[in-house]
Regions:
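Short C-terminal tail/terminal secondary-structure segment
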Residues: 2, 148, 233, 244-259
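Canonical Rossmann dinucleotide-binding motif of NAD(H)/NADP(H)-dependent dehydrogenases/reductases
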Residues: 4-36
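Substrate-binding pocket helix/loop in short-chain dehydrogenase/reductase
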Residues: 100-101, 105-111, 213
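Active-site helix of classical SDR
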Residues: 124, 159, 167
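Alpha-helical segment proximal to the catalytic Tyr-Lys
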Residues: 129, 172-176, 241
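Residue(s) in the substrate-gating loop at a strand-loop-helix junction
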Residues: 143
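C-terminal helical subdomain
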Residues: 183, 191, 205-239, 243, ...
Length: 259
């Protein structure tokens, strides 16, 4: 049974159309939040919103390309007009890329930067503007790639390192405004994002690579989106009111136990 930890709160989740973002939306909806589901894929975002509503929650989809600052500003204005003043924000939207510094083209780097770095920056600007004077909780999705070297993930690692430092900066600059800003660093998590990534990067070898990735986790398996959502709920709820400027790993021991 839900404790309704987010009752009366308005929350926005970017990349809410699938995977971790969808799991966060579904759990936040169960906990009483009024949800704005943002996704560049309008159909996927609406599907998530419909699932939240079917479970008795309140949710609306707002199609949004987080890399476009003007679009982000318009969407944040619209969602607050529809749902109320913003209390919680989860910056989850992101893309992956395979490559070393030599094999990553400038176009590849620009594409990853636009979504994973500029996209978070764009959202953070609108979020802190909305929360100043009333407080709130912001959660950024970083990665184990923020902390350790991972083969063939140059652009992705760069982008997630930037997410982590943006988290620390926002936490420092806005703590006096009652705004908490934290990050979580997932390890390997089984999502449609991962399945699609494996199909594109390793055609014909998806099953082999899935098992290989799962074995990199000391705990012996990939994480599930619902496990990430549970940590997100804690950090965005009043249970975490004394936590800000933190990066919490949720990686099956990938960073601290890897040998």
């Amino acid at each position: 049974m839900s404790d309704h930890k987010l009752a009366g709160k308005v929350a926005v989740v970017t990349g809410g159309g699938s995977g971790i973002g969808r799991a966060i939306c579904l759990l936040f909806g169960q906990e009483g939040a009024r949800l704005a589901v943002l996704d560049v894929d309008a159909d996927a975002g609406e599907d998530t919103a419909a699932r939240v509503r079917a479970a008795g929650g309140v949710a609306e989809c707002f199609p949004c390309d987080v890399s476009a600052q003007g679009q982000v500003e318009s969407v944040f204005a619209a969602l607050q007009e529809r749902l109320g003043a913003l209390d919680i924000a989860v910056n989850n939207a992101g893309i992956a890329h395979v490559g070393t510094v030599e094999t990553t083209s400038e176009a590849d780097l620009d594409r990853v930067y636009a979504v994973n770095v500029k996209g978070v920056y764009n959202c953070l600007r609108s979020e802190v503007s909305a929360m100043k004077g009333r407080g709130g909780a912001i959660l950024n999705l970083a990665s184990v790639a923020s902390s350790v070297g991972i083969p063939d993930r140059f652009a992705y690692s760069m982008s997630k390192g930037a997410v982590l430092t943006m988290t620390y900066s926002v936490a420092c600059d806005y703590v006096a405004h009652g705004i908490r800003c934290n990050a979580i660093a997932p390890g390997r998590v089984h999502t449609p994002f991962v399945d699609g990534f494996l199909r594109r990067a390793y055609p014909g070898r998806e099953a082999e690579m899935f098992q290989k990735l799962a074995r990199t986790q000391p705990i012996g398996r990939m994480g599930e989106p619902e496990e990430i959502a549970a940590l997100a709920l804690f950090l965005c709820s009043d249970d975490a009111r004394f936590i800000t400027g933190s990066n919490l790993p949720i990686d099956g021991g990938f960073v601290s136990l890897k040998v």
